[in-house]
Amino acid sequence: MSTSAMELLLTATIFCLVLWVVRIFRPQVPKGLKSPPGPWGWPLIGHMLTLGKNPHLALTRLSARYGDVLQIRIGSTPVVVLSGLDTIRQALVRQGDDFKGRPDLYSFTFISDGQSMTFNPDSGPVWAARRRLAQSALKSFSVASDPASVSSCYLEEHVKKEAEYLIKKFQELMAGPGHFDPYRYVVVSVANVISAICFGQRYSHDDQQLLELIDLNNEFGEVTGSGNPSDFIPILRYLPSATMDTFKDLNRRFSVFIQKMIKEHYKTFEKGHIRDITDSLIEHCQDRKLDKNANIQISDQKIIGIVLDLFGAGFDTITTAISWSLLYLVMNPRIQKKIQEELDTVIGRERQPQLADRPKLPYMEAFISEVFRYSSFMPFTIPHSTTKDTSLNGFYIPKGCCIFVNQWQINHDQKLWGDPSVFRPERFLSPDGTVDKALSEKVTIFGLGKRRCLGEVIGRWEVFLFLAILLQQLEFSTSPGVKIDMTPIYGLTMKYSRCEHFQAQTRPFVLKCPEA
């Protein structure tokens, strides 16, 4: 046999072998269903180059071509990407049990030593019980009323204190340098709110321990948002990685801080005198009961995981929302003035805004909804996974498949919004001036279904109250001639480049009679 014939035979054999291996490992698609469509990908790396620096934009473009259910590969891992409000609601709400899982990603095992409630792949009874416990504790020390305070609830009391501090601080900075970076101060105030709820403790704005913790959280968002190749290319786990080393270290330090706070709470814990979320969780841990039949227990390690999840998520998301809000206010003075006119008319200046004022401030609510939509600062949910073989829109999705949910695409879908690239709060107002609830509920930023963010209600309330108190007293602008870079920086939460050129002037007092 000639050499060329041998080479041809060898090539054909290898091709057949590869084809056989692919067929063996490819899930068998049930009759009547199809595999999700998607673009051609490179060997070994799949579509990693296609995603680039802004995966939300790349996947939005792909969804326009391939539809609301498409499949890509990241490394050797198949990933199904969901877009479109109806499709995502179908998956996460109507078929919520099928899509409530978390992928067992390598990097997730280092968050809370694998005990994180948010990132852990468990989606069974223990996870559900932990989630109910966390939800109950969060409600008890945020939206529940505080009998010792004139505020309507614990959250309102904490936010008012921090907002008052911010007003004073911004005024001091204007009297000094004459400009400032609001993020530097907002993040500490928001962190203090969740710290008071979780630990019953407020920190100084110069406290090095808290500032270090904030830096760790920012790093976490950057590293997690940029993706970890070893999650999808297993062989990389055994090779040196500076990014992975950083990720492990910041999670270790974050856990050490939370463990320290919990140990201090154990030392001073008094049954019947529950001071904060940590005390509430310790009480449940000592009772060893999570359900009415006492079948599910919670360990000390899982307490750390719950507190870490609540604390970490409790200030990054809200700080980012407030930061984008301030940016859009200085870029749109007309909108800022309209919000302040509404505040003056409804509340006046004799008292601070309260949570009870929300229904009477529709333009403020419309503005916040537009901030959430336009910025889409959480472009994706944390990845989901399927808990069983299922189908969606006629496409077969096997058990354990990693699912990306593109929230950015929903919030910029021209079919939903008409002019998604225009910042226009009025879109959320009905002709009679009230909030169009049906439309505002289409804004997707906190996820949907069984994995929906636990703190969504608290987050919305907190953003509203901070902004209302600040805008009642201050008018925000930027230094003359300064241009702000509004380009979002991709991450777990998308932020804009820090800017030192914000200004705030105390609003002149104009006596107006508030509405009855």
UniProtKB/Swiss-Prot annotation:
Pfam families: p450. InterPro entries: Cyt_P450, Cyt_P450_CS, Cyt_P450_E_grp-I, Cyt_P450_E_grp-I_CYP1, Cyt_P450_sf. It is a peripheral membrane protein. GO terms for biological process: amine metabolic process; estrogen metabolic process; hormone biosynthetic process; hydrogen peroxide biosynthetic process; lipid hydroxylation; long-chain fatty acid metabolic process; phenol-containing compound metabolic process; progesterone metabolic process. Glycans are attached at S63. It catalyses: an organic molecule + reduced [NADPH--hemoprotein reductase] + O2 = an alcohol + oxidized [NADPH--hemoprotein reductase] + H2O + H(+); estrone + reduced [NADPH--hemoprotein reductase] + O2 = 2-hydroxyestrone + oxidized [NADPH--hemoprotein reductase] + H2O + H(+); estrone + reduced [NADPH--hemoprotein reductase] + O2 = 4-hydroxyestrone + oxidized [NADPH--hemoprotein reductase] + H2O + H(+); estrone + reduced [NADPH--hemoprotein reductase] + O2 = 6alpha-hydroxyestrone + oxidized [NADPH--hemoprotein reductase] + H2O + H(+). Keywords: Cytoplasm, Endoplasmic reticulum, Glycoprotein, Heme, Iron, Lipid biosynthesis, Lipid metabolism, Lyase, Membrane, Metal-binding, Microsome, Mitochondrion, Mitochondrion inner membrane, Monooxygenase, Oxidoreductase, Steroid biosynthesis. The keyword Ubl conjugation does not apply. This is Cytochrome P450 1A1. Substrate binds at F220. Its EC number is 1.14.14.1, 4.2.1.152. SUPFAM superfamilies: Cytochrome P450. Constitutive expression of this enzyme in liver may be related to the sensitivity of guinea pig to TCDD.
